[in-house]
């Protein structure tokens, strides 16, 4: 699209729909200026944390100025709808929860990088724009913004060889995925003469050019790399291990959520010509990811790598139900993406607190007898572990039950069986963690310390894990409306 045409047709009134994004951008700019003018001090550290929290809160409040449930703005390059708004609110809340842990983590390491605050804001901005567009250029730029921010944050502690290695792997493979996405976008535009994914999908039929097929495959491949689908996952365990644990939690929760949104938006536009290819390819990738992800997690001794492979397996769970290409499948996928961001972030934040001890090395053996030293952390970690496993009455159980139901409705029973088998495999390492924490008689020589904000964040995540598990319709009703609305809009086009 010609940029002059875009600017000429844009009503300045439409900028009100970007207030949350604009607020985050202003927050990043203010933090950047403060980093330049303020000298290093304890006061500066506290100011950065609280100003970050303030701007995130203002961004949340700015959603109240929006009065549209569906609207294409800026000549159709940006879409305002309930899925985008819900996703962005979730991403902001997850960022709010991560910041206190990141602040404490850097303090404890005696290496305080102020730039990590505005880089986090820029990554959040990329996630927000990624969550609200069907336009190939906006999606590509958003992917770049999130990815570059993650590369930098992964290599935050450059003195560590592991940090360097993980960051380099992430940079190289992430860069390849961006190039693949760009090639895919170029092929799709060349074949369809449109930058809108909705129009591109509708333009496909059985007589279409092979270039459109190649473009779609390349574009989906780029997202498969980003969310860690096997066999495109090689960067993820190393990057998650290399990054500071609060950043790992941020990437595994808000990052995964943002990367999945474009795939979720795609489902209602898979037409009859694409359905068979979509179901076969997506279901095979999902089955491999579920089984191999859990099998690799089973042999890990490092807790961060274990949770990294668990994250890969959960991407497989979400992908499996997307293969059904149904309204129920989309509802289950949206629900599972959101609930994983809660329980996944909670597990990584508990590890972040444990890492504050100099004696902690993230080894599975070190968690033995943890309940003796810190009951709150042990119980919280157990709650998140049971949720990841899918034990009632947690949100993880509801999520997996909905995924299985979504597969059963479309008679994809074999993939449902794979889901059950993968969950059975995961029992081996999840239960081992809980047994070590509560039943192993080992004397722990360290006691984790955490402040009130960290306590509140973990407590809130534990509450949500139980509350949304026991009252699933609180979240489910809203997500059902989102899914039905997306299919309704697709059918009207």
Curated annotation (Swiss-Prot):
Mark the transmembrane ranges. Answer: 18-38, 47-67, 82-102, 111-131, 137-157, 171-191, 210-230, 244-264, 279-299, 334-354, 379-399, 412-434, 456-476
What UniProt keywords are attached to this protein's entry?
A: Cell inner membrane, Cell membrane, Membrane, NAD, Quinone, Translocase, Transmembrane, Transmembrane helix, Transport, Ubiquinone
Keyword NAD included in the entry's annotation: yes
- Which Pfam families does this chain map to? Proton_antipo_M
User: Where does the UniProt entry say this protein principally localizes?
Assistant: membrane
* InterPro entries according to UniProt: NADH-Q_OxRdtase_suN/2, ND/Mrp_TM
Which GO BP terms, alphabetically?
A: ATP synthesis coupled electron transport
Task: State which Enzyme Commission number(s) the record gives.
Answer: 7.1.1.-
Its record classes its membrane topology as: Multi-pass membrane protein
| GO terms assigned for molecular function | NADH dehydrogenase (ubiquinone) activity; NADH:ubiquinone reductase (non-electrogenic) activity; quinone binding
What is one cellular component GO term in this UniProt entry? plasma membrane
Record note on quaternary structure: NDH-1 is composed of 14 different subunits. Subunits NuoA, H, J, K, L, M, N constitute the membrane sector of the complex.
Similarity-based family: Belongs to the complex I subunit 2 family.
Which HAMAP family does this UniProt record tie to the protein? NDH1_NuoN_1 (MF_00445)
User: What does the function comment of this entry state?
Assistant: NDH-1 shuttles electrons from NADH, via FMN and iron-sulfur (Fe-S) centers, to quinones in the respiratory chain. The immediate electron acceptor for the enzyme in this species is believed to be ubiquinone. Couples the redox reaction to proton translocation (for every two electrons transferred, four hydrogen ions are translocated across the cytoplasmic membrane), and thus conserves the redox energy in a proton gradient.
Protein name per the record = NADH-quinone oxidoreductase subunit N 1
Organism, scientific name: Hydrogenobaculum sp. (strain Y04AAS1)
- Name of the coding gene: nuoN1
